[in-house]
């Protein structure tokens, strides 16, 4: 069978909002997500910093200031709260079945600037052959320490190439 890859961003593609808006931003003190994202933009500009690294850094700093411990499980659990667009959960099986009828092996991939651990907590995580998304480095207690991988807009093209080459 011929292999076909469907490649998705996550935020505002499969879900109506940025994943951090499903609880974690409120917990660190942002009732209005725009205030957080504006702060991230300011930090990125002031420090000539990649915006993805800036949001990851800011999540760490804000959580520390509020005494909130963000670890793998915290991110995974917040992923369970992410709302998906109507029809998204059914889409994957439908398109795989459609492809199979036509002799195609359909695979689904995520390439996202969002957080991999949160995507893993969603109800659709199992649908993906691979999830390429931003990740944190964790300490011995699984608490986040620092951004480990930040997938920005230009890096996404690198992952398209990797998928095309069979990873």
Predicted regions and their residues:
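Alpha-helical substrate-recognition element adjacent to the catalytic core
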Residues: 1-145
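Conserved acidic, metal-coordinating active-site core of Asp-based
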Residues: 129, 133-167
């Amino acid at each position: 069978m011929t292999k076909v890859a469907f490649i998705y961003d996550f935020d505002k593609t499969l879900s109506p909002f940025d994943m951090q808006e499903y609880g974690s931003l409120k917990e660190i003190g942002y009732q209005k997500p725009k205030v957080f994202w504006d702060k991230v933009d300011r930090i990125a500009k002031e420090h000539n910093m990649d915006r993805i690294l800036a949001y990851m850094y800011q999540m760490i700093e804000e959580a520390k200031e509020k005494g909130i411990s963000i670890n793998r499980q915290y991110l995974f659990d917040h992923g369970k709260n992410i709302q998906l667009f109507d029809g998204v959960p059914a889409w994957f099986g439908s398109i795989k079945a459609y492809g199979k009828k036509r002799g195609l092996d359909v695979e689904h991939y995520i390439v996202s600037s969002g957080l991999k651990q949160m995507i893993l907590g969603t109800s659709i995580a199992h649908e993906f052959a691979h999830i390429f998304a931003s990740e944190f480095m964790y300490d011995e207690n699984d608490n986040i320490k620092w951004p480990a991988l930040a997938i920005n807009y230009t890096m996404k093209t690198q992952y398209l190439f990797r998928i095309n080459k069979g990873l």
